[in-house]
C-alpha cells in the first residue's frame, strides 16, 4: 500500500515507542539504579558516609538527664560534580531494502541500534561501579568458581563473605541486594551443588532484565557487562542513580526515494551515591 502524505510522521512516533520498549526490556544494569531527571548539563550529587553516628563531646545518646541538652550527631557527605554523557547510534536503510527485502530490515535495524546503546550504557554503569574506590571491599574468591577440582569450588562462601562485609558497613545486602555475574560465572553457579542445594536458592518465576533467580537472599542478575573473572554485589535502587537529561528518543531522517536513517539517542550519567554498598569478588574464573 502506498504511503500517504504525513504518514512518515506517524511512523516516526511509532518507531520511537518501539525503541523505548525494546530498550526497557534489554537493560540489565540500569533498572537497578534509582532513576531521576535532570535539566542541567552538569549535576552535583553527594556520596554519603554510612558510619553509624555517635555523640560528640561529653554527652551520650543513652541516658539524657532531665532538662539536659541533647548530644550532637553529624552526618557527612562528599560533593561530586559531573557532566551528562550522550549515547547514540543510527542506521541507514535504502528505500529498496525498506520496501523489498525478504525480511524486516527496519525491525532488525531498530534492534541493532537499541542493543548498541543499551550495551554501551550498561558497560559504563559497571565501569563506574568498579572504579569506585571506597567500597566494602574487592576480595579474591577462595578458589575459582570453575576450579578444575570440584571440591575446591565454594562460591556460597565468597557470596556470604561479601554480604558480611556490607553488613559491617551498615548496609543490609539481603534487603534489595543483587549479585551481578557474567554468563560464564552464572554457568559455574548453576553447576555447583553448594549453590543449587542451598535452602536459599530458587530460580526466577519469570526471567526479565537478566534476573535469573536468588541465592543467599540476593537476586542473581546475569549480564555480559560484568567483566571476566569478577562478580559484584550491589543494592537495588540504593547503590547508584541514573540521572537522565534526555530519555530514549528516536528520529527518522527521510530522503524520499533514496533512504531512511533511524537515529536514537539518550543522555545521562551514573552517580554512585552509596559506595559502601558495593562489594567485588575477583578470581572467579580459573
State what each model feature region is.
Residues 55, 101-102, 188-191, 271-273:
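Short helix/loop capping segments that flank catalytic or ligand/cofactor-binding pockets
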Residues 8-12, 22-26, 144, 148-155:
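Intrinsic-disorder-associated interaction segments
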Residues 75-136, 171-172, 179, 220, ...:
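Long, contiguous amphipathic alpha-helices that act as assembly "spine/axial" helices in icosahedral shell
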Residues 2-12, 24, 39-51, 78, ...:
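Sequence/fold signature of self-assembling virion shell proteins
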